C-alpha cells in the first residue's frame, strides 16, 4: 500500500498543527455545543494496551479518537508515533495487514519503537482479528497502544473474546449517549460545577447531595424537560432538536447492521413497535410473537438480544428478592437507552409516542442500568427498578403531583425504596425529584 494513502488520514505527520484542520475536529470546534467525552480519560495509554471502544452508532466514537490524538499532540508526543486509519473501505484482514505493514515500514524509517495506533471501524474488513492477533503474537505491537472501535459484530460474533491474554493493560470502554448529568454540563457548565455527585446509593448520602443541588432545581427541571425531548446523542444535542435527517441517518445505520447479520428489517420494526406500545409494562415473548405476527417467541428473544447488543435497549428481568437472582422465565421490562429512540421508532413504526410519564420512567431505568445491575419486581405491587448495589434498593417512579410515603415499605431483602417524584422532596418519606436524583447520580 502506498504511504500517501496513510498520510491522507494522518495529516499531522507533515505538521502537527494540521490536526486543527481535521474534518472531525473542525466540526467539533464549530459546534454550537461541544464537550470532551469523559471516556477520553478511561482509555489505557500504557504499552502494551489493546483497547476496544463500543457503543451505539453516531455516539461520537470517531470524534473521541480525534480528540485523543489532538491531546497527545498537544502533550508533545512525536507526531509520527500517532497513526490513525479508518477501516471501513477495507475488504478483509489481508488489506488491513497491508495497512499495518506500510505503517511499520514508515515508523522503522523514523526510528520509532512505540506508537499510538487508532483503528476506526476495524470490524469492517472480514476476519480483521486475524491480523491484529498475528502482530500481537509476533511482538510487533509489544510497545504500542492500540485503540480499536467497531460495530455490534464485536459483540454478536464474540470477536473480542478472541484475544485472551492478549489485552495487556487494555480496557473495554462503552461509549453511550450523554447522561442527564453530562447533559447539564453541556448546557449549563456553571451549574454543573456546583452540583455534587453521590458516592453511593444510601439515604443520607442521596438527600445530603440533593439538598445541596436544590437551589438550582428550577434550571435543572427546565433542562430535564429539554433532555426528554432530544436525549443525549451528539447530533441531537448540537442541533438542540431531533431532526428528520438525524432519524433517517440513524435508521439507515440500523438497516445496514441488520443486513450484515442477516436479520429482517420488518421483524425488527415489529418488535420496536411492540416495545413502544407495551411500555412501561413487562412483556411476554409469547404474547409479542402472537400479537405482532412473529413466527416464534425464540425469534422475539433473538431480536431483543440484537437490540441490546446494538445499544438500543436494556432488558430488565424480574428479580427474586429472597435469592437475589433474576427470574429469566418471567416477563421482562424493556427500556430504550436514550429518549432519541422513542422519537426514531415512533416515526419509523408509525405509532404514537407513549405518555411523558412512560418516557420519564424509561430514562430513570436506563440511567440506573448504566451504573448497576438493574431489575424490576412485581407481586401485589410493582417496584419499577430494583438495583443490586451494596444492598438491594428499589425505585418507584411517580411523574405526578402526588406520591406515597415509601420510607416504611420493606420487601424481602429490599430494605430501602425511594419514590422518585415530579417535584416533591421529603427525606422522611423517601421522596426525591427525578431530575434532581439523575443530576447527582
Residue ranges: model-predicted function:
Residues 138-162, 307:
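Sensor-1/coupling segment of RecA-like P-loop NTPase cores
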Residues 1-44:
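N-terminal pre-Walker A segment at the start of P-loop NTPase domains
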Residues 53:
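Hydrophobic anchor at the beta1->P-loop junction of P-loop NTPases
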Residues 2-3, 237-391:
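Accessory nucleic acid-recognition modules appended to NTPase machines
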Residues 399-441:
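Catalytic cores of nucleic-acid endonucleases
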Residues 61-62:
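Conserved lysine of the Walker
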Residues 81-113:
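Short glycine-rich substrate-engagement loop in P-loop NTPases that contacts/grips substrate
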Amino acid at each position: 500500500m502506498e504511504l500517501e494513502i496513510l498520510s491522507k488520514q494522518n495529516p499531522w505527520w507533515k505538521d502537527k498543527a494540521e490536526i486543527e484542520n481535521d474534518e472531525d475536529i473542525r466540526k467539533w470546534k464549530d459546534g454550537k455545543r461541544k464537550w470532551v467525552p469523559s471516556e477520553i480519560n478511561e482509555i489505557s495509554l500504557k504499552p502494551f494496551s489493546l483497547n476496544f471502544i463500543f457503543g451505539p452508532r453516531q455516539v461520537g466514537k470517531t470524534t473521541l479518537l480525534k480528540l485523543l490524538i489532538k491531546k497527545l499532540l498537544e502533550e508533545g508526543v512525536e507526531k509520527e508515533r500517532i497513526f490513525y486509519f479508518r477501516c471501513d473501505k477495507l475488504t478483509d484482514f489481508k488489506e488491513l495487514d497491508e495497512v499495518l505493514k506500510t505503517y511499520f515500514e514508515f515508523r522503522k524509517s523514523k526510528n520509532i519503537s512505540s506508537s499510538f495506533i487508532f483503528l476506526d471501524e476495524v470490524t469492517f474488513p472480514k476476519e480483521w482479528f486475524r491480523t491484529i492477533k498475528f502482530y500481537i503474537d509476533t511482538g510487533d505491537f509489544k510497545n504500542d497502544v492500540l485503540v480499536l472501535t467497531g460495530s455490534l459484530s464485536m459483540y454478536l460474533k464474540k470477536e473480542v473474546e478472541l484475544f485472551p491474554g492478549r489485552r495487556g493493560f487494555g480496557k473495554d470502554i462503552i461509549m453511550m449517549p450523554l447522561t442527564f448529568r453530562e447533559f447539564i454540563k453541556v448546557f449549563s457548565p456553571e451549574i454543573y460545577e456546583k452540583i455534587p455527585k453521590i458516592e453511593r446509593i444510601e439515604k443520607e448520602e442521596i438527600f445530603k447531595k440533593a439538598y445541596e443541588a436544590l437551589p438550582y432545581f428550577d434550571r435543572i427541571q427546565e433542562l430535564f424537560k429539554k433532555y426528554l425531548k432530544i436525549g443525549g446523542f451528539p447530533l441531537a444535542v448540537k442541533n438542540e432538536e431531533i431532526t428528520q435527517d438525524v432519524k433517517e441517518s440513524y435508521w439507515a445505520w440500523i438497516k445496514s447492521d441488520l443486513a450484515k447479520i442477516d436479520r429482517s428489517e420488518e421483524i425488527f420494526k415489529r418488535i420496536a413497535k411492540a416495545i413502544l406500545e407495551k411500555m412501561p409494562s413487562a412483556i411476554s415473548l409469547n404474547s409479542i410473537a402472537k400479537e405482532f405476527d412473529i413466527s416464534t417467541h425464540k425469534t422475539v428473544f433473538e431480536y431483543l438480544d440484537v437490540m441490546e447488543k446494538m445499544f438500543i435497549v436494556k432488558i430488565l428481568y424480574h428479580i427474586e428478592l429472597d435469592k437475589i437472582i433474576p427470574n429469566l422465565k418471567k416477563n421482562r421490562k424493556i427500556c430504550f437507552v436514550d429518549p432519541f429512540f422513542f422519537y426514531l421508532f415512533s416515526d419509523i413504526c408509525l405509532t404514537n409516542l407513549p405518555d411523558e410519564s412512560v418516557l420519564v420512567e424509561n430514562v430513570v431505568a436506563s440511567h440506573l442500568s448504566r451504573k448497576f445491575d438493574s431489575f424490576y419486581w412485581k407481586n401485589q405491587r410493582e417496584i419499577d427498578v430494583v438495583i443490586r448495589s451494596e444492598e438491594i434498593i428499589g425505585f418507584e417512579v411517580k411523574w405526578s403531583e402526588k406520591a406515597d410515603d415509601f420510607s416504611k415499605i420493606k420487601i424481602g431483602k429490599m430494605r430501602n425504596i425511594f419514590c422518585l417524584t415530579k417535584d416533591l422532596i421529603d427525606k422522611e418519606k423517601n421522596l426525591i425529584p427525578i431530575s434532581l436524583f439523575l443530576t447527582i447520580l
